[in-house]
A protein has these predicted regions:
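Residue-level preference for the first positions of well-ordered beta-strands
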Residues: 20, 117-119, 156
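Short phosphate-binding loop-to-helix
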Residues: 96-114
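Residues that scaffold the ATP/ADP-binding catalytic core of kinase and kinase-like folds
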Residues: 32, 130, 168
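Active-site-proximal alpha-helix that buttresses catalytic centers in soluble enzyme cores
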Residues: 2-3, 11, 15-99, 127, ...
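Glycine-rich phosphate-binding loop signature in dinucleotide/nucleotide-binding domains
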Residues: 57-59, 111-116
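A glycine-rich beta-strand to alpha-helix segment
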Residues: 117-137
């Protein structure tokens, strides 16, 4: 990971740039209870393409937190397949289902500071609201506009975070990329 150096009155220190990847699950089928909705054939293709895109851009998560709903579990499986051998084992989190931006951010705040690249796979409206809340003023303009105008299935927002996961709250993560599949 890249490092950013800054000098302070008390001397110099280094803060590592961390990467946060927020993803909405891929396209899901209808007709079942919400928690048990599977991905469509297109959803499987979207999630696999998302994993391959992440790998091609060097956006490799060290930890993946996923909602425990079927469609997010399946999305995570296909993304991991696209990431290949570098894919970590996903941690399923019931607290990422039907969740607000505040709850997603609270989950991020609990991540070990030893993790430098984190991926969260969840649902609307939480993923879009969290991405909007976290965007700093120096975020990429095109990516920011994409996040504001929609967060379709299998969309990914990629942030750079300078500082601790525990302190992440709002307007303090730089959105550097956004992609929908």
């Amino acid at each position: 990971m890249a490092e950013n150096s800054s000098n302070t009155a008390s001397g110099s220190h280094r803060r590592e740039v961390k990467r946060l990847i927020i993803m909405r699950h891929a396209e899901a089928d209808w007709g079942l209870n919400d928690f048990d909705r599977p991905l469509t054939k297109r959803g499987h293709e979207q999630a696999a393409a998302a994993g391959a895109w992440l790998a091609s851009r060097g956006y490799i998560p060290e930890q993946i937190m996923s909602s425990s709903a079927l469609r997010t579990r399946q999305t995570t499986t296909w993304v991991s397949d696209g990431l290949g051998a570098k894919a970590p084992t996903a941690h399923l989190d019931e607290g990422l289902y039907e969740v607000s931006a505040s709850r997603i951010i609270a989950r991020i705040n609990s991540v070990s500071e030893n993790v430098h690249a984190l991926m969260v796979v969840s649902h609307l409206p939480g993923v879009q609201d969290a991405a909007q809340r976290l965007m700093s003023p120096d975020s990429d303009l095109n990516a920011s506009m994409d996040v504001y105008y929609g967060f379709p299935p299998s969309s990914i927002a990629v942030f750079e975070v300078l500082g601790e996961w525990a302190l992440l709250d709002g307007a303090d993560a730089r959105l550097v990329d956004f992609k929908s599949f």
